[in-house]
Amino acid sequence: MKIIYVTARLPYGADEAFIIPEIRQLQESGHEVLIVPRSCGGPLVHGRELVKYASIETLASRRVCRTAAGVLLKARGRALAALWPLNASRSLSIALKNVAVIPKALWLADVAAVWKADHIHCHWAGTTATMAWLASTLSGIPWSFTAHRWDIVENNLLAQKARSATLARFISEDGLRMARAVGLGPEVHAAVVRMGVDLPEETAVPERTGAVVLCPARLTEVKGHRFLIEAWRILKDRGVAGELWLAGGGELRPRLASLIESLRLSNSVRFLGVVPHSELLNLYSAGAIDVVVLASVDLGGGNHEGVPVALVEAMGHGIPVVATASGGTQELVLPETGILVRPADPVALADGIERLLSDRVLRKRVGDAGRQRALDAHHVARVARELAKAFEAAQRRHAATGAEA
């Protein structure tokens, strides 16, 4: 199949590395994939090797505007009919965001037709899905989308998009429940297909005197870093040796740095900044990390953790994890596969981390169980096969509909 993948920024930026294994696996399975980022520019942090598979144009480049004008001239009535549902956008800000991607959506319809795409798939149910939806309507090529978390909460015409799509994919049961709560109907072909990750055939066992605890997460409020830092102070007061590494960038770094200094932790807490995905996996493969921690919190209004790919990757490398019972994390970290603690509770976090650091046998047992959990639910080969089957089924249904017409 020839599949177009619409992303927010990938191959650019630092936030969509979790999509890369899925794309690679589809390519290795014999499918052609063309990546179309909604927005372009910025650093090639994770996706440098994907640029050659991408069609890159800014939202309103000369080529995009020229092609969009041509599509409007050739199929004005169909284009206006495709655009009409955008009137139902539930707020002015969402409507303006949808309007902003119209030229690129029209351009995408032309690109998909010229490339002879069999299917259009997009990640995120926001404006990337608006692009894919409009392009599908104009080109007649079936489409689908993957919804994550914030994009479900935003509810940018989610139910309307899902009715048009051949598959509304959710990465967690929690996400599907959230979508049902904002109007996703029973007539929609919706399914939970979890994110797939690359998992190594072998895992490394750390051989060090000082422990390394890693938190691979953006420095944002929902990730709960302040509770982890407070937990680290508790561990230091208990005499626990080792370092805490924070991998990720974000607006909270100055505030967290001040907290670290005020708690006298500057000698044992390190900011790694944004770590390229391949380098992060190399740390895991080399046995450089003893425990991975996510201290995520629920901020209300659906603003909580999905199923964190960062945890899946660590578990897949046999690294034991400590996480908070927030959002979709509870679907991933089951009893014996990791340590799950109350959110926003530094003492509970400290206790969970100390349990693992103080007991090598427990670390090995939890790490092995976590790895098996990741293999069973998130191996990218299985996930990509499931997606490819869904895309192929959509193509068959589309062909049958065309034959009947």
Where are these regions (language model features)?
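Conserved acidic donor-binding segment of nucleotide-sugar-dependent glycosyltransferases
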Residues: 332-346, 355-361, 376
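A short, well-ordered alpha-helix in the C-terminal region of glycosyltransferases
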Residues: 268, 348, 355, 362-377, ...
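Nucleotide-sugar-dependent
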Residues: 278, 282, 287, 294-309, ...
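Nucleotide-activated donor-binding/catalytic signature segment of Leloir-type glycosyltransferases, i.e.
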Residues: 255-281, 286, 290
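N-terminal subdomain of nucleotide-sugar transferases
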Residues: 1-63, 141, 404-405
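Short hydrophobic beta-strand element within catalytic cores of glycosyltransferases
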Residues: 293, 311, 316, 320-323
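A conserved mid-protein helix/loop that constitutes part of the nucleotide-sugar donor-binding site
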Residues: 17, 210-234, 239-240, 251-258, ...
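Donor nucleotide-sugar binding/catalytic pocket of nucleotide-sugar-dependent glycosyltransferases
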Residues: 37, 152, 158-202
